[in-house]
């Protein structure tokens, strides 16, 4: 369904004895935004996805076909219980969407922005907490600073908005070449090339747990406005790879890589260890999906959607540069 301009819609439609929330999800066609759109649609919400219609649309949703930077009046005829902004990476992304929503009438009740743990400078003591100052992180560069500016732009115009800062997201629909890279190695029986001793720590968060956090915010409207979200426990690279191999029914064998200038050439994470303090998250959810369980879900999706993964040249680099070492 493509939305056209028309009479201004009412928020919270009464249907079959209950109110159905109207949710606007930016994106909706790839990994996180698609999972979120489908998650809330399955819950019975009326989910509207805002994108340019270049990819298949998520199930049980309504399409608003538009570029968020050139919205015209298409959203000014709509009202939503919540805007779930999954695809804002810059201040302009936020400002253009808010301009498109309009200010003449209150067009939404809640606004939830998915930001990132990349907003914390690497020089701060870890784990990073929401009360620490944000700033440039040398590892994340413009990605992190742009997310900071997006947060600032939002709070300037919508002081009661909510911001979630996750670490590495994973789960079904993940087309980013992370767990899928390890699954590729496992399925092909490759020795895994491990950065140094493999003790670098990684922090993950299942995309369904992210949805649960959003759901809690919309239901309870907590007083805090910024939440770090993520699994409480970090795992080493080695532990994570072993879990991925075991999920694929294999046992990992390792080669240790030393002296390569950039591990990004052959591995799916930067040489950077960070951890978020997720104590405040307990106000939203009290448990998270165990990593082993989440990876099983991710592997099942991967097995049926290998062609949807955006692969990088890690295996080619390993074959050409590392196997002969």
Annotate each predicted stretch with a short phrase.
Residues 23-42:
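N-terminal Rossmann NAD(P)H-binding glycine-rich loop of SDR-like oxidoreductase domains
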Residues 98-146, 156, 162:
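Conserved Rossmann-fold NAD(P)-dependent oxidoreductase catalytic core, especially the SDR/UDP-sugar
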Residues 151-173:
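Conserved beta-loop-beta element that borders a ligand/cofactor-binding pocket
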Residues 173, 201-208, 227-247, 289, ...:
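Substrate-binding strand-loop-helix patch
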Residues 183-192, 200-235:
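Alpha-helical substrate-binding/gating segment
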Residues 216-267, 272-273, 312-325:
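Mid/C-terminal beta-alpha module of Rossmann-like enzyme folds, strongest
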Residues 261-287, 293, 304-308:
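Conserved C-terminal active-site "lid" loop/helix of NAD(P)H-dependent oxidoreductases
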Residues 291-325:
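Amphipathic terminal alpha-helices
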């Amino acid at each position: 369904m493509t939305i056209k301009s028309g009479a201004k819609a009412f928020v919270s439609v009464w249907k079959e004895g209950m109110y159905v929330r109207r949710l606007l999800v930016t994106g909706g066609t790839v990994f996180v935004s698609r999972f979120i759109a489908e998650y809330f649609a399955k819950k019975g919400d009326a989910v509207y996805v805002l994108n340019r219609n270049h990819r298949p649309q998520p199930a049980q949703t309504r399409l608003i076909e538009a570029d968020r930077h050139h919205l015209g009046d298409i959203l000014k005829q709509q009202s939503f219980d919540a805007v779930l902004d999954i695809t804002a990476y810059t201040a302009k992304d936020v400002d253009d969407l808010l301009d498109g929503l309009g200010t003449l009438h209150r067009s939404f009740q809640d606004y939830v922005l998915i930001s990132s743990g990349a907003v914390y400078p690497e020089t701060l003591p870890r784990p990073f907490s929401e009360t620490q100052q944000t700033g440039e992180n040398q590892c994340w560069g413009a990605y992190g600073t742009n997310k900071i500016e997006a947060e600032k732009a939002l709070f300037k115009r919508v002081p009661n908005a909510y911001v979630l800062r996750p670490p590495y997201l994973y789960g079904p629909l993940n087309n980013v070449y992370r767990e899928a890279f390890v699954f590729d190695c496992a399925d092909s029986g490759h020795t895994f090339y491990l950065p140094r001793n493999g003790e670098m720590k990684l922090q993950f968060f299942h995309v369904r747990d992210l949805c649960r956090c959003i759901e809690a915010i919309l239901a309870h409207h907590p007083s805090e406005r910024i939440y770090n979200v993520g699994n409480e426990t970090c795992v080493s690279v080695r532990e994570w790879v072993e879990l991925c191999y075991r999920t694929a029914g294999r046992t990992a064998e390792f080669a240790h890589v030393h002296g390569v200038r950039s591990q990004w050439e052959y591995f799916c994470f930067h040489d950077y260890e960070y951890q978020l303090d997720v104590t405040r998250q307990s106000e939203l959810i009290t448990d998270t999906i165990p990593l082993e369980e989440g990876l099983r879900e991710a592997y099942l999706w991967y097995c049926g959607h290998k062609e949807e993964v955006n692969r990088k040249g890690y295996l080619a680099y390993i074959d050409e540069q590392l196997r002969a070492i």
